[in-house]
Amino acid sequence: MTKTAMIDVGGGFRAIFGCGVMDRMLEDGIDVDMCYGVSAGAANMTSFIARQHGRNHTFYTKYAFRKEYASAESFFKNHNFANLDYIYGTLSNHDGENPLDFAAFEANETGFTVVACNAEDGATKYFDKSRVRFDDFDIIKASSAVPVACEPYVVDGVPYFDGGIADPVPVQKALEDGYDRVILILSRLRDEVRKQQKDLAPARILERSHPAAAEKLRMRYKTYNDELELAKHYEAEGRVLILAPEDLYGLNTLKKNFEGLEMMYRKGYAAAEAIPAFLQA
């Protein structure tokens, strides 16, 4: 029996592309056996696994414009541009404004792996679904802690940074785990080559406190580019389906505009049309 995995690589506000993909999948009744989430992609997948259609869209297009969610004020006050405790605690807990349906999340047999980077030694950490607990989404926060923009997030006594600096496109991980086909959701153009330049300045800052993680950040461009090339190789073999936006609509990791968010969501929704044929081939 064919086993299918899905990967959402995250990408800050660009990651709303994946929300569109997953909402279309929920409408079409498409399930997968395993979800691999990186950074914001991990958060997207919690709603997908809980089958909460439209929940992610509300976070990106409504809550994200609140200063409590992500702002320079939050950075200067809490040393975190994105207030992870507000997003994945205040809003998401059972008594929050838009709680995750934890019972549905837990009951769904779909597996879930969350990628993070150990801030102390730079090692890749793959958290299991079982570490997502009632009103405890710490591994999502850890996977989303963008270096320098956020402090490392501590889980079980260990500090972690964003999974995107450790294993940004975990296609090889999914295949090694035994999945035959992989749906890969990107939030950059599929042929975009990452450049090292933009990571050098934050890596120099990070090096003062977390040198191993800084080296991971410094080399992220190569890790991402190499993993994406590998994904394209597997795509040519029919084992991977790459879904990616054709335009970023003015969005980046920490920059947003309402029109761009809506366009990215719609493009993700439309891109999901390719999934049934891929799974049936």
PLM feature spans:
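Patatin-like phospholipase
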Residues: M1-V38, T46-A281
